[in-house]
Every structure is written in C-alpha cells, then in structure tokens.
C-alpha cells in the first residue's frame, strides 16, 4: 500500500515531458524484455545494446530541448556538464569491462548494464530538469 502511494505521488509530481518519455520508454523496454530474459548470451547483449541506443536517442532529444531553452551564457556550462557525464560513463564502462572476476562474458554484461543504467538515469535527470524549466 505504501509503495502504491509513493508511486502515485511520484506520478503526480512528475512533469509532462518526463511522463511522456517514461511512457514511451516503457513500451520500448517491454519490446526488448523477451530477449533480455531469453538466456541467450548474444540475444541478451544485443537487446541490451539496442535498448541503450533507444535511451541514448531520448538523451539526445532532452539534451537538445534543454539547450534550446538555456540563455547563451548557460549553454557552454551545460555542454561542459554533459561532456563530464559522458567521460564518467565511459570510465565506468571501462572499469566494468576490466572486472573479469567472473569471466570476460560477465564483464560484457556488466559493461552493458552500466551503460544502460547510467544512460537511463541521466535521461530521467534531464527530463526532470526540462520540466522544471517549463
């Protein structure tokens, strides 16, 4: 019951862009779910990469929307912030790839998961920011 109330509260307070994006991506994630749960290593990795690519499209979209709204003096600051985030994501992926404790295949899964989770989190962060601007 408490979880339901928290979810309802989050939905009420979420902004219009975030709501639309969340609904769009829910459909996309459901599309890839069978492959992610298939048990086939190649199928799972391929689905993960494709899903991350879809989140990347959303990231680029919301990034550009924010950029259009920002005053000129804030644009360079925002671009630098995004570049720092991209570098941190690359470093996290590289670290995950280097972690072969459970073997190289698991390192690939770890890297794919890291890229997906970080990209999704950044999209949600920027969507909230964009909604606050409107």
Which residue stretches match the model-derived regions?
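Sec-dependent signal peptide recognition
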Residues: 1-6
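N-terminal signal peptide c-region/cleavage motif recognized by signal peptidases
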Residues: 9-11
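N-terminal alpha-helical modules
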Residues: 14-134
